[in-house]
Amino acid sequence: VVVLAAAVLFVCYWRQSLTQPISSDGAANALQAWDMLHGNLLLHGWLLSDVSFYTTELPQYMLIEAIRGLGPGVVNLAAAMTYTLLVLLAGLLAKGDAGGREGRARFLLAAGIVLAPQLSATSTLLQAPDHTGTAVALLVVWLVIDRARPRWLVPVAVCVLLAWIMVADSIVLLTGIVPIAVAAGARAARALAKRAEPDWHELSLAAAAILAGVFGVMAPLIIRAAGGYTTAPVPGHIVGLDRLPGAARVTFHAALNIFGANVVAAHSALELAFAVLHLAGAALAAWAACL
């Protein structure tokens, strides 16, 4: 049943992806993967954007191109595959170790919240790589932490996975590495205060996250020193408080887009109806974050 549902979702996401033209970003990613597939594994001579996707989406593109060749359809297929995995992994993580009706309810609730990406968000979620693949890889990390028994292999796997992701997308520093280090460190400190002895598993997870950040920073530098690709960092600067309302509005709309609940961006009555329906999912996620 799960395999059939995944196949149906994949086809639906692929069809939705086809409604938008391929951007130059997606075309560049396809060409990078094609170059890697033909021997230029370090992407010598390439100047990439601030997010390289070198260890996440580019290997995925290579796999698809090895099967069907180079073409614009690679972007659509990869995006559909990525979003299908996102839905399934979100459901599995929410299910936890629950079984029976509770397990199914938890799976369906989490998967249902992210099930139907809004049409206005197609170019973000179902086109060229835009952190969605990073979210898929990060869900795998959460699953390892959640499901695996506490043993030395767990922090090792977490460190390797987080470093692997960070090579592709440094946003994982904010969405994965720092949260794990802080949460695991806090739990270890609480255990030390209660039992007068450290929780070595939590301490090792915090250390694994910190080491992953170091490795994730060093790896692209090593690749560059070996003659591989270079990246163009995003210029950043501190803005005044007068820019805060506009930035907050953009952030709010982006969050609604993730849940398919951006009522402002709806272009038709049907899309508006779905957006209003998805507001319930966004509200549930906000409520869970506050617990």
Regions found by a protein language model. Give the residues of each.
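Membrane-interface micro-motifs in multi-pass membrane enzymes
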Residues: 22, 50, 54, 97-146, ...
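Juxtamembrane segments of multi-pass membrane glycosylation machinery
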Residues: 41, 59-81, 86, 98-99, ...
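Membrane-lumen/periplasm interface segments of specific transmembrane helices
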Residues: 189, 203-280
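Transmembrane-helix motifs of polytopic, lipid-linked glycan transferases
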Residues: 2-5, 77-101, 140, 283-290
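Hydrophobic, aromatic-rich transmembrane alpha-helices
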Residues: 88, 184-194, 268-291
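Extracytoplasmic loop-helix module adjacent to an early transmembrane segment
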Residues: 7-43, 62-66
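Short hydrophobic/aromatic helix or loop-helix immediately within or flanking a transmembrane segment
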Residues: 28-35, 47-70, 249-265
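Membrane-interface alpha helices of multi-pass inner-membrane proteins
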Residues: 153-179
